[in-house]
């Protein structure tokens, strides 16, 4: 089995020089997820004074937020993102640095009610030093009734407080607890997350693939890769003062609409920060047999090379024929659509199917408890790696 390596690079606002090979220390706890709607989605790893010097851990905490992380397999990028959140524990006290948009934003404006039924927007205010270093992170604060002076004051306060991913002490501290040792929890996100650093504030109707290209073109870091033509008419209903929508959210909404023939589409940001948009496959790519994932040639792929958005035939399924009147692989009970792939150095490869059974069970439970559904679980299959 090919073992991946984990590497730290500089920030994407610069030339991204190679900083450090983290394979020996981060590789022990490395875990990452790729999804058919987002591409490279998330990753995480832990460091402690058991496997890295305390000074190096603290240096990473102080220096690496917003830096690029890559998983390489045989020299090829098989996951890529940036360090999003870091949680350092020293002497029992937790310190946090994060790029979460509620905590870090360097370009801000406010939208407020200046009169009954009248929404007004301030001009953008930007800390260019922060955006030059980390990328432009827009934030629109939606207010209630306010004066122009009050809205401007809120914008100024947000820029002063949140333009930089500063370190903050969080949580509780047990007084008298003489904790020793240093640990660091690192959470990474794929570059799809940076698409939500910018808003789209135009009212546009266009073909799906055309609007996808337009939206991706507004990104600071992501560029268009393979964009298949989709003539479905879609709409972005935004304005400067109403219904401001983040670019990433709009892209996901378009992908989920599919096409005029009812086909499933998929997309996301992959290697090289390239955005893909394509129709989901109509035939199976892999087979499942006794916990193993196999190619159609019955060989096992490298676990880190497997990407979501494929059909898999279960060779152990009790039913192997589609219902009468259809020859679509999507209707074959022995074939499932894999929407998410997870790989970890400790657990290997697992795939998650898009399926209605688990969704219905959750929906029934939420109806019974009186709560509204916000998310759904899907069935997960664990792959055994040879």
Predicted features, each with a name:
Residues 1-105, 113, 173-209:
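Beta-strand-rich assembly/attachment modules of structural machines
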Residues 33-46, 280-294:
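Short, basic/aromatic beta-hairpin or loop at an interaction surface
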Residues 47-51, 187-194, 274-283, 299-303, ...:
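Secondary-structure transition/turn motif
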Residues 92-103, 113-293:
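Charged- and aromatic-enriched interaction segments used to assemble
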Residues 1-7, 16-20, 93-107, 114, ...:
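Acidic, low-complexity/disordered segments
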Residues 47, 218-227, 287, 297-301, ...:
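C-terminal or late-domain output modules
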Residues 74-76, 293, 331:
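Glycine-centered tight beta-turn/hairpin loop motif at sheet-sheet or coil-to-beta transitions
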């Amino acid at each position: 089995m090919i073992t991946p390596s984990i590497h730290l690079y500089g920030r994407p606002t610069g030339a991204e020089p190679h900083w450090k090979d983290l394979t020996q220390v981060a590789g022990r706890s490395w875990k990452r997820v790729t999804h058919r709607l987002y591409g490279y989605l998330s990753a995480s790893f832990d460091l402690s004074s058991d496997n890295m010097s305390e000074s190096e851990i603290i240096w990473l905490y102080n220096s690496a937020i917003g830096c690029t992380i890559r998983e390489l397999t045989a020299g090829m990028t098989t996951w890529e993102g940036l360090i999003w959140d870091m949680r350092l524990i020293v002497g029992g006290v937790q310190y946090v640095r994060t790029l979460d948009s509620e905590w870090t934003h360097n370009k801000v404006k406010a939208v407020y009610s200046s009169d009954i039924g009248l929404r007004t927007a301030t001009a953008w205010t930007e800390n260019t030093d922060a955006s030059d270093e980390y990328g432009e992170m827009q934030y629109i604060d939606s207010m209630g009734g306010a004066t122009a002076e009050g809205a401007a004051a809120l914008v100024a306060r947000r820029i002063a407080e949140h333009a930089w991913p500063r370190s903050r002490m969080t949580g509780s501290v047990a007084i008298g607890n003489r904790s020793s040792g240093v640990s660091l929890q690192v959470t990474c996100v794929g570059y799809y997350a940076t698409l939500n650093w910018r808003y789209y504030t135009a009212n546009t109707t266009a073909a799906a693939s055309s609007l996808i290209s337009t939206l991706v073109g507004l990104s600071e870091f992501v560029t268009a890769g393979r964009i298949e033509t989709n003539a479905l008419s879609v709409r972005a209903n935004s304005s400067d003062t109403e219904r401001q929508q983040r670019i990433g959210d709009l892209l996901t909404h378009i992908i989920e609409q599919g096409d005029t023939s009812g086909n499933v589409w998929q997309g996301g940001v992959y290697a090289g920060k390239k955005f893909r948009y394509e129709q989901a496959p109509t035939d199976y790519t892999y087979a499942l047999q006794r916990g193993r994932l196999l190619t159609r040639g019955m060989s096992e792929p490298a676990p880190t090379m497997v990407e979501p958005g494929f059909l898999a035939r279960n060779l152990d399924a009790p039913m192997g024929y589609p219902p009468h009147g259809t020859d679509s692989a999507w209707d074959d009970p022995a074939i499932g659509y894999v929407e998410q792939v997870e790989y970890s150095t400790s657990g290997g490869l697992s795939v998650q199917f898009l399926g209605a059974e688990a969704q219905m069970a959750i929906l029934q439970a939420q109806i019974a408890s009186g709560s509204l559904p916000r998310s759904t679980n899907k069935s997960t299959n664990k792959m055994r790696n040879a």
